[in-house]
Amino acid sequence: MTATLTLETMTSEEEYGPRNCVVCGDRATGYHFHALTCEGCKGFFRRTVSKTIGPICPFAGRCEVSKAQRRHCPACRLQKCLNVGMRKDMILSAEALALRRARQARRRAQKASLQLSQQQKELIQTLLGAHTRHVGPMFDQFVQFRPPAYLFSHHRPFQPLAPVLPLLTHFADINTFMVQQIIKFTKDLPLFRSLTMEDQISLLKGAAVEILHISLNTTFCLQTQNFFCGPLCYKMEDAVHVGFQYEFLELIIHFHKTLKRLQLQEPEYALMAAMALFSPDRPGVTQREEIDQLQEEVALILNNHIMEQQSRLQSRFLYAKLMGLLAELRSINSAYSYEIHRIQGLSAMMPLLGEICS
């Protein structure tokens, strides 16, 4: 049981004014050993009450115990401590006190280890810079790729009789463009460029679709469950019109709703993308140990970043939730590859994405 309850847990001084030590009248700092006392009387009681032979008063126990006189008679001061309710059984033994201090030291060390180092902060800035240059602004550029006119209306009724080819062509163009931007993002990362070209290709083929959906989440609206990319609005019905199955789209929407509720900002999206990128278990990877170390480093940075941003990132177990969503993306990745090759003509219209999904 802890010996001290600080004033933060007491009634505020602003409301009731300062509190005084019930032993000597000095300003109290908290409840110590079951009584409201100052630091001086707290320390005195701890030191004195555990002694085998207690102090003796030469004046028959009639000494005044005040802030000015408290040092004059230890016996009367100790007796007053006991009279006001201070309890010997609440004093930790030397062994228990040492254990508590050791626990406190470990907590301080753990807290220090969770703080981002300068090198880790620089890596976040590198990731964030590449993400801001190549991924963040790409959705506003979808308007360049011949969108059907009805995509411009955010409150449009769906038009099931609209020709599918213009929408299919637009879909192929924006997906190819997104993959190109993701490639630029990865090539802007020195850690990624340090790998062999073969492993770079393997990692990109494995992670491109996952990074695409992590990034696309920034455009997702929880209320409407639509994606707003610049002046364009994409609904689930558009993907159905192109040929995607409802079961697959339900996976997509569930992922985006779950991730959007976590209220991430660009640094967290960039770190999550890096986690997906540096996955050592992708097919064709040869430098598995090196890539595993890179992913561990990014994971540590993500966890430490979350700890540093606790006041903003209120979600409990956020790191664990993000790891779960990355695992969910693996299933989406596999299902997406199947859909791309199932929809007639789509793979041929976007050979780059077709190669990635092969």
Swiss-Prot record:
Classification via CDD domains: NR_DBD_VDR_like
Domain notes: Composed by a short N-terminal domain followed by the DNA binding, hinge, and ligand binding/dimerization domains.
GO annotation terms (biological process): cell differentiation; intracellular receptor signaling pathway; negative regulation of DNA-templated transcription; negative regulation of transcription by RNA polymerase II; osteoblast differentiation; positive regulation of transcription by RNA polymerase II; regulation of DNA-templated transcription
Organism domain of life: Eukaryota
Homology family: Belongs to the nuclear hormone receptor family. NR1 subfamily.
Domain called NR LBD: residue spans: 119-358
GO CC aspect terms: cytoplasm; cytoskeleton; cytosol; nucleoplasm; nucleus
Modified sites of kind Phosphothreonine: T48
Protein's UniProt name: Nuclear receptor subfamily 1 group I member 3
Gene symbol of the encoding locus: Nr1i3
Organism: Rattus norvegicus
Organism taxonomic ancestry: Eukaryota, Metazoa, Chordata, Craniata, Vertebrata
